[in-house]
Amino acid sequence: MHILVIDDDPLAGEMTAALLESQGHNTLLAHDAMDAVEQLDTHSDIVLIVSDMHMPLVSGTELLAMLREQGNHLPFILLTGDTPSETLQQTPGLTACLCKDAELADTLAAAVKQALDG
């Protein structure tokens, strides 16, 4: 089982993946939405998606909408550098929306546990 981490910033993506790996999860990295779709097509053992919000060409919410339209209903956690608005947190199909802050290790661990146990 893998968690797909999507972030256009390679360092941020690697840090998120390392955080998840330190919690016992296997990860795959994608650097944009198209790479993510390729990873999803290639790896049938992906159980959760963790995506950055702000990416060039296709944002995290646009990727979520695109995947839902294609019938992909994997849990989807969105990460943002901004404080998530209530509207963003209520995006249809979104499992969780978390702020990339000092609490991320704890909030991400809790959101992943809830998504996978859910």
Language-model-derived ranges and their functions:
Residues 52:
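Active-site residues of response regulator receiver
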Residues 9-13:
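Short acidic/polar segment at the start of the alpha1 helix of CheY-like receiver
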Residues 107-118:
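Receiver (REC) domain switch/output surface
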Residues 14-22:
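Charged docking surfaces used in two-component/phosphorelay signaling
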Residues 29-38, 60:
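Helix N-cap/capping motif at the beta->alpha junctions
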Residues 55:
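Receiver (REC) domain active-site loop signature in two-component systems and cognate sites
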Residues 38, 61-73:
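Short amphipathic alpha-helix used as the core "switch/output" element in two-component signaling
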